[in-house]
Structures are given as structure tokens and as C-alpha cells.
């Protein structure tokens, strides 16, 4: 199965077409992130049949030269966002990987779907595209992964992400929950949660190859 098969029915619906028309106006009259060409980059880099892990974010970074379609990731030239810095600190504490690039394209190519629940945002206005229709789209993506794939790890950081558990068949997938890596909550249980080693232990137990979380020089 391919993403195009999953997207076909969604994109034909009236509500999606309304959202598309709204976004056309937004991109014409506002500064919107990511660039149009990168809205669906998470799906371009991680084909449906390759998805081993889903890391769920909220909406894209809303500063210049940051968002490029992958949750938590920023463009190589950008400064490290605080949440990503904490993710990397936990990565080093968990499995000893020291990453220097804020770009997560290599994770995406390993089978980690870095999915925001909202895929666009106005510059400088967090959550400005909340409730325009993206949540319906990404909920259906999560449900399709749950239904058609087996033994996927869903990493859900923070309460908004954890609300999506209801979309996932927990009898056939593995859920990792903790507080969000944001500086506001990282010390309440994100640090020490070992999501990276837990993910790989599960994948190996199911006969799948582990994720190479360490930097591979691709960026």
C-alpha cells in the first residue's frame, strides 16, 4: 500500500477541498511555513510500507528557515529548538548517540514518520492553522497506519499527542508515552524515559531492524 491510496479518498472530500482553497489564499497573502513543496515531506521521505515508528508533533515551527515538513526537525542551518535539544540530550543519555545537526531527514529515511498533527502555520503565529482541517487528515493517517501496518512504535510526547491513543490498536502496536521534551515539561518524566532504546528493543523483538538514531553524515 502507498500513501497515495490512503490520501485519495481524503483529498476528494469537500472538507479537504475547502482547506486546500483556504491554504491557497494563505500562501498568496501570508508567510506560511513550511514552503508549499515541503508540506508533505514526512510522507515523501518515509513510504507507507517503511513506517516502523511514528513520532507525533503538533504544528510546524513558525520562524524563518526552520520548518521543512518533519516534526521536531529544522533545516540544517537553523538554531536548535529547545525541544529538539532535549530530545538529543535524552538520546545521548539513553544510547550514547551525540548528534550535531538539527535536521532529522536520516531518521525519516530509517522509517521514522515525523508527523505533525497540523502541517502548516503562519509565520510567528503558533497554532494559527489549528482546526482548518489538518487534524482530520492526520487522524486518518494515524488510523491507516494502525489498521494496515503491524508492530509500529507510536511515540507520544505530551497530552495532545496522547489523546491520539484512541486512534491506535494497542493490541498490535507499541505505545511509548512521556511528558513532552519541551523545557516546560522535560524534567517531569521525559528525561530518563529511554524512548530510543525501548523502540529498538521492541522492533528487534518483532524481527525488524532497529533504527539508527545516531548521525549518519547524510545531512
Swiss-Prot record:
UniProt keyword list: Cytoplasm, DNA damage, DNA repair, Hydrolase
Signal peptide boundaries: none
EC number: 3.2.2.27
SUPFAM superfamilies to which the protein is assigned, alphabetical: Uracil-DNA glycosylase-like (SSF52141)
Any single Gene Ontology cellular-component annotation: cytoplasm
Gene Ontology terms for molecular function: uracil DNA N-glycosylase activity
Gene3D superfamilies per the UniProt record, alphabetical: Uracil-DNA glycosylase-like domain (3.40.470.10)
Matches recorded under SMART domains: UDG, UreE_C
Subcellular location: Cytoplasm
Pfam name, any one: UDG
Matching PANTHER family: URACIL-DNA GLYCOSYLASE
Name of the protein described by the UniProt record: Uracil-DNA glycosylase
Source organism of this protein record: Staphylococcus haemolyticus (strain JCSC1435)
Amino acid at each position: 500500500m502507498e500513501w497515495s491510496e490512503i490520501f485519495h479518498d481524503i483529498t476528494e472530500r469537500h472538507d479537504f477541498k475547502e482547506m486546500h482553497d483556504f491554504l491557497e489564499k494563505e500562501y498568496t497573502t501570508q508567510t506560511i511555513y513550511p514552503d508549499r513543496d515541503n508540506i508533505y515531506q514526512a510522507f515523501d521521505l518515509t513510504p507507507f510500507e517503511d513506517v516502523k515508528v511514528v513520532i507525533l508533533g503538533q504544528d510546524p515551527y513558525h520562524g524563518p528557515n526552520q520548518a521543512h515538513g518533519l516534526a521536531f526537525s529544522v533545516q540544517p542551518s537553523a538554531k536548535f529548538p529547545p525541544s529538539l535539544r532535549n530530545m538529543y540530550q535524552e538520546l545521548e543519555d539513553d544510547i550514547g548517540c551525540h548528534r550535531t545537526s538539527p535536521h532529522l531527514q536520516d531518521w525519516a529515511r530509517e522509517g521514522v514518520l515525523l508527523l505533525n498533527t497540523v502541517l502548516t502555520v503562519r509565520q510567528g503565529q503558533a497554532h494559527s492553522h489549528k482546526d482548518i482541517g489538518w487534524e482530520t487528515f492526520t487522524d486518518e493517517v494515524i488510523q491507516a497506519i494502525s489498521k494496515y501496518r503491524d508492530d509500529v512504535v507510536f511515540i507520544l510526547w505530551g497530552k495532545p499527542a496522547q489523546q491520539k491513543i484512541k486512534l491506535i490498536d494497542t493490541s498490535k502496536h507499541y505505545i511509548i508515552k512521556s511528558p513532552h521534551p519541551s523545557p516546560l515539561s522535560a524534567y517531569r518524566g521525559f528525561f530518563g524515559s529511554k524512548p530510543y532504546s525501548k523502540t529498538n528493543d521492541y522492533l528487534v523483538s518483532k524481527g525488524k531492524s532497529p533504527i539508527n538514531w545516531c548521525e549518519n553524515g547524510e545531512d
